[in-house]
């Protein structure tokens, strides 16, 4: 689906207000063997983030689910089995989301957020999610950390960050960790502040 459709559809959040001087860093696909290193890096940089967790992985690591929240980050769902949402019928799609909420063990607050694995949405799956009360989280800037192992490439992709951007990263990759200090330094030099997605879109 095109970004213009997301921007016009109630219940979808892709880019925050450009007047806010804030951006949201988001990380998909955790928890995994590198989660604590990501959390330590964000602690050092003193920035909060939003983590979209795979329910099946979260169910096996409730300690890490709690740790994200303890360190001040927002957590949200990313499907239970990382299946493409646009390939699922209504029942299976909502079951994926409900099972993930259960795996997150009461660490959610307010209306639940969800990000479709691979950004895989069509009109039907989008309607199902919004009608069920989910806030659908997309992104406005893709770091493309899945297509390189060079931190310099990520820094280059993120050089155009501006107010309101929601930036897509992934857990489990050393090059993403290596690039983060430079990316955060650049956004601070531009007068931007890192916040969670919840705070970026708070009214």
Where do the language-model regions lie?
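Active-site beta->alpha N-cap acidic-glycine motif
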Residues: 1-88, 92, 96-99, 103, ...
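Catalytic domains of cell-wall/extracellular-matrix polysaccharide-remodeling enzymes
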Residues: 59-60, 83-203
């Amino acid at each position: 689906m095109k970004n213009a459709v997301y921007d016009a559809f109630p219940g979808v959040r892709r880019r925050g207000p450009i007047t806010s001087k804030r951006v949201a860093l988001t990380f998909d696909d955790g928890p995994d063997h590198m989660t604590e290193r990501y959390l330590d890096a964000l602690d050092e940089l003193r920035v909060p983030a939003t983590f979209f967790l795979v329910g099946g992985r979260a169910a096996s690591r409730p300690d890490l689910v709690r740790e994200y929240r303890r360190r001040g980050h927002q957590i949200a769902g990313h499907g239970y089995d990382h299946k493409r949402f646009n390939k699922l019928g209504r029942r299976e799609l909502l079951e994926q989301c409900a099972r993930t909420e259960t795996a997150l063990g009461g660490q959610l607050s307010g209306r639940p957020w969800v990000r479709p694995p691979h950004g895989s949405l069509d009109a039907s799956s989008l309607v199902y999610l919004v009608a069920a009360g989910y806030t659908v989280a997309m992104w406005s800037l893709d770091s493309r950390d899945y297509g390189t192992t060079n931190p310099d490439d990520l820094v280059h992709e993120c050089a155009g960050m501006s107010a309101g951007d929601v930036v897509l990263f992934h857990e489990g990759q050393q090059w993403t960790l290596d690039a983060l200090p430079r990316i955060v330094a650049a956004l601070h030099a531009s007068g931007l502040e890192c916040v969670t997605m919840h705070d970026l879109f708070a009214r």
